[in-house]
């Protein structure tokens, strides 16, 4: 058990969500999320039931950190990857080329192109906090205890206990494919039809050629032309100097 690899995931209890949106504010502040964009959501499922047995459900929502993430398959530069040490799906901002192919590949629609950087962005579970032993900002700020985060493989973790003791457990499947989301809803059924989850839209087979090979060839060709131009200019200068003598 001591050598077991960590598997981080989220456990959500919608019954405890009061729609205060403190998690959204904390996420934005922690990760410098641009205005008009967000890494996490709280969806209002509306009034349910019939009078006098009425209820209202709020559903916290963000990246599922899937076991089989289509976004990883879609990324031509391998900027999006699943960390082998803990299972979190993250984006290497240095490697991202901003092609946007990962956006439609995500069936949960949790990605966006950051207008400030031109790169893909999404929830990374506040990796900078997790690596310091702290919970993601949204979890640490959740006043109702609706959002939980931890090692799903650790029997002593809060998420493991919550799943074991839950009255019901549900994950949100993508359409037509099992992505293996590490994002669990407990104790209160969630209607995924209201969340607009779709099938992943993977890029065409020539995406790598179009976004990686061709730009690389053009860059190399451009460098070659510049080199030839510099050499030609030097020859002209040399010729003029010899002529002056």
Spans of features found by a protein language model:
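Non-ligating segments of multi-cofactor redox enzymes
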Residues: 1-245
């Amino acid at each position: 058990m001591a050598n077991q690899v960590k598997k981080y995931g989220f456990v959500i209890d919608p019954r405890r969500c009061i729609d205060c949106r403190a998690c959204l504010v904390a996420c934005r502040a922690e990760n410098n999320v641009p205005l008009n964009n967000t890494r996490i959501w709280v969806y209002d499922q509306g009034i349910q039931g019939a009078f006098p047995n009425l209820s209202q459900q709020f559903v916290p929502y963000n990246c599922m950190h899937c076991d089989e993430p289509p976004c990883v398959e879609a990324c031509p530069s391998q900027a999006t990857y699943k960390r082998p040490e803990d299972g979190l799906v993250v984006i290497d901002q240095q490697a991202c080329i901003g092609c946007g192919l990962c956006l439609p590949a995500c069936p949960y629609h949790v990605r966006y192109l950051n207008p400030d950087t031109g790169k893909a962005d999404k929830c990374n579970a506040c990796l900078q906090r997790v690596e310091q032993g702290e919970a993601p900002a949204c979890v640490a700020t959740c006043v109702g205890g609706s959002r939980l985060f931890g090692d799903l493989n650790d029997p002593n973790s809060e998420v493991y206990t919550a799943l074991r003791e839950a009255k019901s457990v549900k994950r949100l499947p993508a359409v037509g494919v099992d992505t293996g989301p590490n994002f669990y809803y407990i104790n209160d059924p969630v209607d995924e039809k209201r969340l607009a989850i779709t099938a992943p839209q993977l890029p065409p087979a020539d995406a790598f050629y179009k976004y990686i090979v061709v730009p690389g060839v053009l860059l190399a060709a451009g460098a070659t032309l510049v080199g030839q131009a510099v050499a030609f200019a030097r020859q002209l200068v040399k010729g003029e100097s010899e002529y002056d003598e």
